[in-house]
Amino acid sequence: MLMPQNPQIYVDADACPVKPEILKVAERHGLEVTFVANSGLRPSRDPMVKNVIVSAGFDAADDWIAERAAENDIVITADVPLAGRCVAKGALVTGPTGRVFDPSNIGMATAMRDLGAHLRETGESKGYNAAFSPRDRSAFLETLDRFCRRVKK
């Protein structure tokens, strides 16, 4: 009989504004973290932290995470298509602002992303994103802590 693996935290690390917060919460809960990026990451001596540099190919980091994420893992990404792939596998998914992606809302999130892309392509929208705020950081910390408690049960 196969033993279930320990829950992992996978981070879509390119341009992720909450890396230090992820490390603190993961350490508090004793969970392993894997940062995945197309470019350099700051090395860590912590054996619970892995850095994976993938090729510069389109969606290479997303593909790496989606292939490995499993039920009861935590995925941190702002990328809606990656979130959808991981939700479909049973992972708990949050964005760096604390936005939760789950089966009840991933369809709408995908539709809104596609609509926004269409509006930008047609010039109807400039596509500005709001600046990352202290409120976003706080919401993220709450969500990640809740997810960590859930996967440890």
UniProtKB/Swiss-Prot annotation:
PANTHER family: UPF0178 PROTEIN YAII
HAMAP family: UPF0178 (MF_00489)
The species this protein was found in: Agrobacterium fabrum (strain C58 / ATCC 33970)
Descriptive protein name: UPF0178 protein Atu1478
Family: Belongs to the UPF0178 family.
UniProt xrefs under NCBIfam families: PRK00124.1 (NF001095)
InterPro entries cross-referenced by the UniProt entry: UPF0178
CDD domains the UniProt entry points to: PIN_YqxD-like
